[in-house]
Structures are given as structure tokens and as C-alpha cells.
């Protein structure tokens, strides 16, 4: 039955896009459930109508990136529907000038770069501006093509992704619909509790949380995961780059989690890393301590 109810929630929001202002809802269920094989997902992905459909399913065992999946949605939609200079697009959306270099480098190479350091007294301001930038770019793209996003296991999201959802709840867009699937049995990171509670409160006030049932018996691999149990690739150069990307997008808590995972591998699993990568790792780790 959970398949039917989950699909029903997705269809309801999909059909509200462009007609109603508030189109963000949460679908809560017990135990684990994957949306990859839902018929409604395949159908909307293959639709040739005017709505851009995207879905993402987070893992319990891997670290979620900063602003995931919104960053890749922005890049994909810009390439497909707008083209041209991504920097000009950012200027049009009012992206803070210090953030454009980070976003441009991610768009072009997948590796974030920033010349200017972040001032300690500017951290909170820059985090707000980055979240606003992500939301404003999504809104601008939705003017070109209405946007439907389904994110399953959303409780595993990074703080930056959750902050983006909160911003979109507070500043709604009729052209964007979002369904957040949440396994109520598994909790997210401690660093996300405060903003998570604010999201739940906002959605509850709007009767936008649906309880769609249980996915069956609890599976052994579904539990709250400690950081040292999260999987990372043993290609440490890649893992360090992923943590560095998260840090450059100012999600310092999530970047610190990534660094702690790498550190655990090095200290307790006798993993080998070359000296150059080790130096870079400690530089990234130190910069997450904001």
C-alpha cells in the first residue's frame, strides 16, 4: 500500500504545479522504502510535457553533498534549457559575487575553487546568501520549465539542503513542487536538528505532512548510522575533493563529517595515503573548524 500512497502524493503535487503557491510536502513512512521502481517515477521521467522532473534517493551509508540534489539540477537545467554563460546566469539571479567563482568552477569541472577566504564574522551572512542563491536559481529556471523534485530519505540530507527547503517553504514558488520522503525510523545528523524541527513545524502548520504507512519489517541495515560507519571511496584524493567541495559551499558541519570519516579510515583501518594528499586533507579539515 505504501507504493500507492507515495505515488498518490507525487501525483498530487505534480498536478498542483503552476496552479497553487505552496507545493512542498513531506511523506513520512516507517522502515525503509525505495522509490526507484515506482511506476510514477518512470512515467514522469519519460513525459514530454512542460515539467522538468527530477528525483534523488539518499543513502544511509554515504555522505550527502552540499545542496544535493539542487546543485546538479541547476547545472543540468541550465545546460539543457538556457545555455551560454553560467556566470551571466548567476548575475541575473543576483548571486553574491564571492560565490560565483565557486559555482562556476563546480559547473565547469565539478571541483570548487575560491580565491578569497571566508571571514569569520561573515560566515553566517555568506551561508544565508548561498542558500538564497540556490533557491533563486531554481526559481529562475522554473520560469523556463516548471520543476518537480522528489527526494527520498530526505532526513539524510546535508544541512545546506535542508536550509534550502526551509527557504523555499518560507518563500514559495508556484512553479516548483517538491515531495520529501522521510523514513521516520532513521534520524539525520545532530547538526541538522534545529533546522529540521523548523521545517516540520512549518509543514505541520500547513497540513503538508502525510503519514503513508509502513514499508514492512525493519531491515537490519536500516538504522541511525554513525559517521565512522559511512562509506567513502578509498580513493582519498576524490574523498578529500568531495569534502573540499562541501566546505567551499559553506556547509562546514557536513564537510567536517566527511573529514572525520577520512580520519577514521586513516587512524583505525590502517589505510594508506600519499604525503601530498595527507597535507591537503589536514588543510581542508582545519578550514572546516569554523
Residue ranges and their predicted role:
Residues 1-19, 112-118, 222-245:
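Conserved adenine-nucleotide phosphate-binding loops and their immediately adjacent elements
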Residues 31-34, 59-63, 155-156, 183-188:
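Conserved nucleotide-binding/hydrolysis micro-motifs of P-loop NTPases
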Residues 1-47:
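Walker A/P-loop-proximal flanking segment of P-loop NTPase domains
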Residues 33-143:
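Conserved phosphate-binding/catalytic loops and adjacent sensor/switch elements of nucleotide-binding enzymes
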Residues 22-26, 53, 146-148:
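Residue-level preference for the first positions of well-ordered beta-strands
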Residues 39-40, 224-290:
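Extended alpha-helical scaffolding segments used for macromolecular assembly and cargo binding
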Residues 16-19, 47-48, 139-144, 157, ...:
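Conserved catalytic network of the ASCE P-loop NTPase/AAA+ motor domain
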Residues 146-151, 155-213:
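Sensor-1/coupling segment of RecA-like P-loop NTPase cores
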